[in-house]
Amino acid sequence: TSEEGDLFWNQLDFQANPIGRINRKFDSGDFYSPGEWSSIVDEELQEPTPLELQIHTDIINYPDSVHLNVHVFGQYFSSKVSGNHRLSILFSESHLIGDQLDYSQDPEHVYDYEFNHLLRGSLTGAEGLTVIENPNSGDTFQSDFTYDWNSDWAINNCQIIAVVSDENGYIINCLGQYIIE
C-alpha cells in the first residue's frame, strides 16, 4: 500500500475487493463493482473535456540514484469550469505478482495475481496542489518537479499519471504514460 492509496481507500463508502472508483462524480465515496466499470467508463469518455494536458519527463542517471524531472502543461478550451483546480502527479507500476484478496473467489486469496497499474506514490500528495483558479478559455499552467526515483520500483514498468481535479475532487482531465517508452 501507499499513503495515497490508503487515503483513496478510506474515502470509499464501502470497502471490498475488487472495487473501483470512477471519477468521483457524485461523491468521493462512490464505488462500483467490476460489472459496472465498462459502461460507466464509456459514459465518462463521451464527456467533453475543457482541458488538454501534456507530460514530459527527463531521466537523469547518477551513479547511486535516478532523478526524474517532470513537466506538466495544461491549456483550457472552455470557461465552463470554475474554482481551484488541483494537479496530482501519481506513479503506478505494472507486472507485480503477489497475493490478492478477492471475496468472489474460492479460495479468497489468489497468490499469484498479476497487479497492473498499482498505485505506488505521488509527487504532489493524493489530492494534489492548486495550479490555477477560475480558469478561462485560453488559460494555461505549467508545473515542474524533480523526483528522486524510488529504487524499489521497476522504472520500466511504471507510469506517470497527471490528474487535474476541481475542489470537490471531480476529475477534469487526466493523462498517463509510461516513464520509459
Description of each model-found segment:
Residues T1-E181:
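Short, conserved sequence motifs used for protein processing/export or organelle targeting and
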